[in-house]
Amino acid sequence: MSDQRVIRAAAVQIAPDFERPGGTLDRVCAAIDEAASKGVQLIVFPETFVPYYPYFSFVRPPVASGADHMRLYEQAVVVPGPVTHAVSERARRHAMVVVLGVNERDHGSLYNTQLVFDIDGCQVLKRRKITPTFHERMIWGQGDAAGLKVARTGIARVGALACWEHYNPLARYALMTQHEEIHCSQFPGSLVGPIFAEQIEVTIRHHALESGCFVVNSTGWLSDAQIESVTTDPKLQKALRGGCMTAIVSPEGQHLAEPLREGEGMVVADLDMALITKRKRMMDSVGHYARPELLSLAINDRPAMPVVPMSMSFERAGADVAPEIISGGQDECQHEPVAG
């Protein structure tokens, strides 16, 4: 019997609030409410949207970024905490899967973190960007493979990667082997210019084709006033314009709605889940089109820990702490990520 599910998804392209602490969270909640009025069941926000992506690190040297870096620490998200509680409540209220990018603060370090909340408000996945890109390495620490999981939500199997993680084919394959149905990708947007938008489009359409899944991609947006607040240099301001490609793509690599390349807005489309089988019938890259006896992937999915107590084996230590590290604590209700 064919898959009868049709899931309405939304990808959001809006600007953060640089001025008011908590302002970006208000924008997240308002967008969730708006999406609910459109019948949306899954919504994706841009990379590290709360409180904002560290654009300053792209156009300023580290020696001139200390105050802005400290401000980001002060507004960063503790998981679990007030931000996750607010988003959890909104997800539960509207029975919506919410995929949110945050700057996570874990004691003295910041991380580029993706959070997935299920339709009952439970946080079902917390993962950290494996390797921050270029300028980002001055801002965030590194994630590990413990978060390379697909979450089984109330509507579909959901996976997520951030920005140039999509250029790591092994990271993408790790999610593909768990049979993700909806891939949620996040990019900063308002960066590099039109060439970045073109690269994003190629990337997300290729992943949709290769994995045989839907891709819901969200990029951020900066207003002219916000760009001018980051840098007064006209040449550097050019580096903070363009680069937006908020879009929803089918398993056949087709846009399901007109993508958003500039300005604020929301791309909404219906995902006919039967298209997954239609694609994989022809090419299942982790099934009948795979050759695991020739090519296979090894993953060290143990959480990276600075201390392993001698009172327990390394394997035992990894098993004991993995759920907390993946989902970010016990305050939010949890579901088990998909194992395979």
UniProtKB/Swiss-Prot annotation:
Catalyzes the hydrolysis of a broad range of nitriles to yield their corresponding carboxylic acid and ammonia. In vitro, shows high activity toward benzylic/unsaturated nitriles. The preferred substrate is trans-cinnamonitrile, followed by mono/di-cyanopyridines and aromatic substituted nitriles, with a moderate activity toward 3-phenylpropionitrile. Shows weaker activity toward the common dinitrile fumaronitrile. Also shows weak activity toward some aliphatic nitriles, including adiponitrile and glutaronitrile, and the arylacetonitrile 2-thiopheneacetonitrile. Nitphym exhibits high stability at 30-50 degrees Celsius and broad substrate spectrum, and emerges as a promising candidate for industrial hydrolysis of nitriles. Immobilization of Nitphym in a packed-bed reactor enables the biotransformation of 3-cyanopyridine into nicotinic acid (also known as niacin or vitamin B3) in a continuous mode. InterPro entries: C-N_Hydrolase (IPR003010), C-N_Hydrolase_sf (IPR036526), Nitrilase (IPR023919), Nitrilase/CN_hydratase_CS (IPR000132), Nitrilases_CHs (IPR044149). The active site is at 47 (proton acceptor), 129, 163 (nucleophile). Forms oligomers. Its EC number is 3.5.5.1. It catalyses: a nitrile + 2 H2O = a carboxylate + NH4(+); phenylpropanonitrile + 2 H2O = 3-phenylpropanoate + NH4(+); an aliphatic nitrile + 2 H2O = a carboxylate + NH4(+). Keywords: Hydrolase. Optimum pH is 6.0-8.0. Activities drop at pH values below 5.5 and above 9.0. The keyword Hydrolase applies. One of its GO terms (molecular function) is nitrilase activity. Highly resistant to various miscible cosolvents and tolerates high substrate concentrations. It comes from the Bacteria. Optimum temperature is 40-50 degrees Celsius. Displays high thermostability with 90% of remaining activity after 2 days at 30 degrees Celsius and a half-life of 18 hours at 60 degrees Celsius. Belongs to the carbon-nitrogen hydrolase superfamily. Nitrilase family. This is Nitrilase. Residues 7-273 form the CN hydrolase domain.
